Amino acid sequence: EEIRYSMSVFKDKILLITGGTGSFGNAVLRRFLRSDIKEIRIFSRDEKKQDDMRHHLQAQYPEVASKVKFYIGNVREKQSVDIAMRGVDYVFSAAALKQVPSCEFFPMEATMTNVVGTNNVLLSAIEHGVKNVVVLSTDKAAYPINAMGISKALMEKVAIAKGRELGSGAATTICCTRYGNVMCSRGSVIPLWVEQMEQGKPITITDP
């Protein structure tokens, strides 16, 4: 009863998931497919991942696959975000560069996606009257020691500043949520360990 009640707020609503082909997007999509939600929009850069997701939905969830619409774009480009944002009620802002080594080698790329890109999503959501935006952060944003964590911490500051700027009673509510390592997600340690064991290699463990 509690689960059905909690999902009732999404009845006949439109949900946008930026970075929707990632680990989070896939999990959320499965959760919402069986609800009374009107439409789920998947926004991402990778047409191959979108095509794979589309075929998977048609094969596994044929009766509800039509609820899912796909938008190719980049959060760094607000114009493409605006197109996907039209008519949206709720947003999960999950588009990010999250691989720690990649962010270390290319910190400006991490900043452009995680900070500027998220700001574009927030601006677009506010302009289009979206009810709620949930910005996905990470536990690495607490006392950050690497570029990924720093970019996510700054992203949180941007979201908090936007919420403060809107003030209480605004049409759009912005919130951030932090979560830790997700088991078997892309870039997580478990797939690496499995691969190393299958190849008979030593398991690598780091000490911060």
Language model: regions and residue ranges:
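A short, basic/flexible loop-to-alpha-helix module at the beginning of a structural domain
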Residues: 1-13
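N-terminal Rossmann NAD(P)H-binding glycine-rich loop of SDR-like oxidoreductase domains
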Residues: 13-35
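Rossmann-fold scaffold of SDR-type NAD(P)-dependent oxidoreductases
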Residues: 18, 85-94, 135
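Conserved glycine-rich Rossmann-like NAD(P)H-binding loop of the short-chain dehydrogenase/reductase
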Residues: 36-52
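Conserved Rossmann-fold cofactor-binding substructure of NAD(P)-dependent oxidoreductases
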Residues: 63-90
